[in-house]
């Protein structure tokens, strides 16, 4: 984290399963207190398919205000839904996961809105392949008069996915990155499969993306 701070770049801590996330949250907050005094360096990741994350976001902002540091967050929908629900059933406790996709979408978009409302104190990365959520963030920022290049607003999509979102946001002047998973094949492939499955869950979006890819291929043939 010191290396990221000294290099002037951001470092995003990934989110894990609920039963091991608390220490990650605590570490992220401690590191933000230390490194985020002047600008966003250390980012925590919030999985908005969890029922408690919207409240956690608001409490985190209060901590940032009282501690005098920038709250930096990456917003995602979530990656471990089946595992979380299965464990809750096996151990007989209430599932920490939203009951359906609509509820996850609702809290994700609410988190995006909240971050933009507090853009002076929160640095937010909207990490989503969902066109509606990405458009919502861009429209709300424009409505608030927030420049596209504001250093507290970022977007990110996986390399090889949702290029139509990435390129249009970049063309409009927003801070956009491509997320590139790196690691052993046995770890990276399951991760990419979960992301692909998540991407296909957005009604109609995958078909639209395929059509756009075919259109671009035909354009390059000419």
What is each stretch, according to the model?
Residues 1-222:
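Positively charged, amphipathic and often flexible ligand-engagement surfaces
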């Amino acid at each position: 984290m010191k290396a990221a701070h000294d290099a002037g770049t951001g470092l995003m801590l990934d989110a894990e399963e609920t039963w091991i996330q608390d220490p990650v949250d605590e570490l992220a907050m401690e590191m933000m207190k230390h490194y985020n005094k002047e600008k966003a360096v250390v980012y925590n990741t919030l999985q908005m398919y969890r029922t408690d994350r919207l409240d956690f976001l608001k409490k985190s902002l209060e901590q940032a205000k009282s501690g005098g540091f920038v709250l930096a967050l990456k917003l995602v929908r979530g990656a471990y839904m089946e595992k979380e629900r299965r464990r809750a059933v096996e151990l007989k406790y209430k599932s920490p996961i939203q009951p359906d996709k609509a509820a996850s979408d609702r809290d994700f978009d609410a988190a995006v809105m909240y971050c933009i409302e507090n853009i002076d104190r929160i640095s937010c990365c909207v990490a989503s392949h969902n066109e509606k959520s990405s458009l919502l963030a861009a429209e709300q920022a424009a409505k608030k008069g927030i420049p596209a290049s504001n250093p507290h607003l970022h977007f990110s999509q996986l390399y090889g996915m949702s290029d139509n979102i990435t390129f249009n946001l970049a063309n409009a002047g927003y801070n956009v990155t491509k997320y590139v998973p790196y690691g052993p094949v046995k770890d990276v492939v399951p991760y990419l499969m979960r992301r692909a499955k998540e991407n296909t869950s957005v009604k109609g979006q995958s078909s639209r993306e395929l059509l756009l890819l075919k259109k671009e291929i035909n354009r390059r043939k000419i």
